């Protein structure tokens, strides 16, 4: 043994050939701070080892290295710039040390080799993979960019254009593509991977492969003419500006980094990379996006605990109510390996549900995600039925009939008679209280809400609603089932609108009040989309949701929270509803809609809206962007905080993920609680109090006032990281 540490070891495997084996005691290898320090010492030991002829990098896991340890990021990024810069210099000196070994090096690349793992193997001379290899640099998805030499080495290995595509998109390449672009030097069968890599290294030692020329290319300036460079970088900047937009600076910064470093040799190019990395690491966007990643891991952890705690795993399910929603739920369950009965009283609805499932599976087939055999198997595991036959075998039943409390209660009561005492019943409802529906059941402890978002196959969030009598076992089983379906389940306590709809309607309330006071809805949409970062402005969102749906939900919320959400008079939603302008579904709402060539609705402004809104809106007047943002966001933020204060949602992490996954809250802002930390709670309180005359929706919750006085934050502990 040449060197041994907790997460890696170095030994001589044959005459003069040493192997650096990454072997962390956990389920995956990560380039955490401790592993980097060990790698540094291992390379020193190798440099001092006599008779060294070549070095192999291997892993004892199915994945080579999944990346850096993201749990350490926020702690690192919180350090002063100078300290972060020094740490990056140290980290890069390790990869330079690997690249500068006086002997050829080869990496045995299997499974996920991402982020820091990819940057590590880029420092070797040769890279051999197998069919499991997935290699790339996903850092821009976290608001940062490669900082261990990825922006320097990747363009020199595969060319600037391919490198910018991978880095700006945060892309991972499968083995075939990686081989084609030169990121891998060979792809072999898994059982021959180690032997092939050893043979490749032997060929390099015997100078059958010119490893020195390869290394020279990586440590020199990029070989691009002025014209090539201008065309390449100008085109990349144009594409990135179009796709990433102004709220996500990391992809553009990566292009600029590669461009600035192109004319320099490795060490100077690394200095440029480091300077830009530090700037991104200190940004609010990086803090928010890394925070979302950590929150997502937190939610996955809760789901894993629930699955372990549940006494029974869901093997079979049933959906009551077919159509688009029921078909979507059945498809998602079957796709993830849980066979499902789809029951309805109307054959036409069953046909619609099966058509929806077939349509979604055909899309998977077209994209090459599944083959025809797999598609047939998934479709066969959805059983459409007009009767309850076989439903007694279901472990979980999802009721997804029409949004009417009497109909839902009758269906739930009826199905309860058909199933065993262990069967869990759930209701897919967006507005009806779970405690109300539970009254129709003999076993309310086996019942909870399971609120899917539309379209089911695309929306990651499922709200799991705990009723007054719901047992922990029921919650654990439903959370585990939602996670098995590939969803992000978040448990909330029962109240009108649950969490997501409860916090959405004060936002719509702020919108209605702005219109009442003479604001232009097209300006509000532009500001909330372009400046704040929502995927849709409120008027457009209402049209997509459906004015009739929003009108009904608004009445439910007003009844549930009369002080804040009760209406003083008619508003814009009432005016459109009464004029039968329901939005996209009937071609006319705030905007008018026509179908484009692809069959997608395209919006346009029409003057016919003006007389409809006139009775509920003051004469048009100008509002600046900041006022619009404040008046729109304060009611939502207040309601989110009240939900935490009242225990409707358990944590800031879960609330922020629900907002991003369920409402499309701008990810670069990280959710309401991350946003409050970013702007400063005391600053928010002072700003919100300037609008207090607008009514109860603008009253700041006591929790925020107390936290502002104490100088507290919501993410203080997470911000410290694990260092």
Swiss-Prot record:
Keywords from the named record: Fatty acid metabolism, Isomerase, Lipid degradation, Lipid metabolism, Lyase, Multifunctional enzyme, NAD, Oxidoreductase
Region annotation 3-hydroxyacyl-CoA dehydrogenase: where it falls in the sequence: 311-723
Annotated substrate binding sites: 296, 501, 661
Family matches, as SUPFAM superfamilies: 6-phosphogluconate dehydrogenase C-terminal domain-like (SSF48179), ClpP/crotonase (SSF52096), NAD(P)-binding Rossmann-fold domains (SSF51735)
PROSITE patterns named among the record's database cross-references: 3HCDH
Documented EC number(s): 4.2.1.17, 5.1.2.3, 5.3.3.8, 1.1.1.35
Molecular function via GO: 3-hydroxybutyryl-CoA epimerase activity; delta(3)-delta(2)-enoyl-CoA isomerase activity; enoyl-CoA hydratase activity; long-chain-3-hydroxyacyl-CoA dehydrogenase activity; NAD+ binding
Pathway involvement of the protein, from the record: Lipid metabolism; fatty acid beta-oxidation
Enoyl-CoA hydratase/isomerase: annotated span: 1-189
Active site positions, chain numbering: 451
Disulfide bonds: none
Binding site for NAD(+): 325, 344, 401-403, 408, 430, 454
Site feature: Important for catalytic activity: 119, 139
Subunit annotation: Heterotetramer of two alpha chains (FadB) and two beta chains (FadA).
Similarity comment: In the N-terminal section; belongs to the enoyl-CoA hydratase/isomerase family.
UniProt-recorded name of the protein: Fatty acid oxidation complex subunit alpha
Lineage: Bacteria, Pseudomonadati, Pseudomonadota, Gammaproteobacteria, Vibrionales
């Amino acid at each position: 043994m040449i060197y041994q540490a907790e997460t890696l070891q170095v030994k001589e495997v044959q005459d003069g050939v040493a192997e650096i084996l990454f072997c962390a005691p956990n389920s995956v290898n990560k380039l955490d701070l401790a592993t980097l320090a060990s790698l540094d010492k291992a390379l020193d030991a190798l440099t001092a080892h006599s008779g060294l002829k070549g070095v192999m990098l291997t892993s004892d896991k199915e994945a080579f290295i999944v990346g850096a340890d993201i749990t350490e990021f926020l702690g690192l990024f919180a350090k002063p710039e100078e300290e972060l810069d020094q740490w990056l210099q140290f980290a890069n000196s390790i990869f330079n040390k690997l690249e500068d070994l006086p002997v050829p090096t080869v990496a045995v690349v299997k499974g996920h080799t991402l982020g820091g793992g990819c940057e590590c193997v880029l420092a070797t001379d040769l890279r051999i993979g197998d069919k499991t290899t997935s290699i790339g640099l996903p850092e821009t998805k976290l608001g940062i960019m490669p900082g261990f030499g990825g922006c320097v080495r990747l363009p020199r290995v595969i060319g600037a254009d391919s490198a910018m595509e991978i880095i700006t998109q945060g892309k991972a390449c499968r083995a075939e593509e990686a081989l084609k672009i030169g990121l891998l030097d060979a792809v072999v069968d898994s059982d021959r991977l180690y032997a092939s890599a050893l043979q490749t290294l032997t060929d390099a030692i015997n100078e059958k492969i010119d490893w020195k020329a390869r290394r020279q290319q990586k440590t020199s300036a990029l070989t691009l003419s002025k014209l090539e460079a201008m065309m390449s970088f100008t085109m990349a900047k144009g594409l990135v500006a179009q796709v990433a937009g102004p709220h996500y600076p990391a992809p553009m910064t990566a292009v600029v980094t590669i461009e600035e470093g192109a004319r320099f040799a490795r060490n100077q190019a690394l200095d440029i990379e480091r300077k830009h990395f530090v700037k991104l690491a200190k940004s609010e966007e990086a803090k928010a996006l890394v925070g979302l990643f950590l929150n997502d891991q937190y939610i996955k952890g809760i789901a894993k605990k629930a699955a372990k705690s549940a006494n029974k795993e869901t093997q079979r399910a049933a959906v009551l109510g077919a159509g688009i929603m029921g078909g979507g739920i059945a498809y998602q369950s079957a796709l993830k390996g849980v066979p499902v009965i789809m029951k309805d009283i109307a054959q036409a609805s069953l046909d619609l549900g099966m058509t929806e499932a077939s349509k979604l599976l055909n899309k998977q087939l077209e994209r090459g995600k599944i083959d025809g055999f797999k598609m047939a198997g998934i479709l066969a595991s959805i059983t459409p039925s007009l009767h309850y036959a076989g439903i007694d075998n279901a472990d979980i039943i999802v009721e997804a009939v029409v949004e009417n409390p009497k109909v839902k209660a009758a269906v739930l009561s009826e199905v309860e008679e058909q199933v065993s005492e262990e069967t869990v019943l759930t209701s897919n409802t967006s507005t009806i209280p779970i405690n109300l529906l539970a009254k129709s059941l003999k076993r309310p402890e086996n019942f909870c809400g399971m609120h899917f978002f539309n379209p089911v196959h695309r929306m990651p969030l499922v709200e799991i609603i705990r009723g007054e009598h719901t047992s922990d076992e029921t919650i654990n089983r439903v959370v585990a089932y939602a996670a098995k379906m590939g969803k992000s389940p978040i448990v909330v306590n029962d109240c009108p609108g649950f969490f997501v709809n409860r916090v959405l309607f004060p936002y719509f309330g702020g919108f209605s009040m702005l219109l009442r006071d003479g604001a232009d809805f097209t300006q509000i949409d532009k500001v909330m989309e372009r400046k704040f970062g929502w995927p849709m402005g409120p008027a457009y969102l209402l049209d997509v949701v459906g004015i009739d749906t929003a009108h009904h939900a608004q009445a439910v919320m007003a009844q549930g929270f009369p002080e804040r959400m009760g209406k003083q008079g008619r508003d814009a939603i009432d005016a459109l509803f009464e004029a039968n302008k329901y939005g996209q579904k009937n071609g006319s709402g705030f905007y008018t809609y026509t179908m484009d060539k692809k069959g997608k609705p395209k919006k346009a402004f029409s003057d016919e809206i003006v007389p409809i809104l006139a009775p509920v809106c003051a004469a048009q007047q100008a509002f600046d962007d900041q006022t619009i943002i404040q008046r729109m966001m304060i009611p939502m933020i207040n309601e989110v905080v009240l939900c935490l204060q009242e225990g409707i949602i358990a944590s800031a992490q879960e609330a922020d993920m629900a907002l991003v996954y369920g409402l499309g809250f701008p990810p670069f802002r990280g959710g309401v609680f991350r946003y409050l930390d970013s702007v400063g709670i005391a600053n928010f309180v002072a700003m919100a109090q300037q609008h207090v005359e607008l009514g109860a929706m603008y009253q700041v919750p006591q929790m925020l006032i107390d936290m502002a006085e104490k100088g507290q934050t919501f993410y203080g502990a997470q911000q410290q990281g694990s260092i």
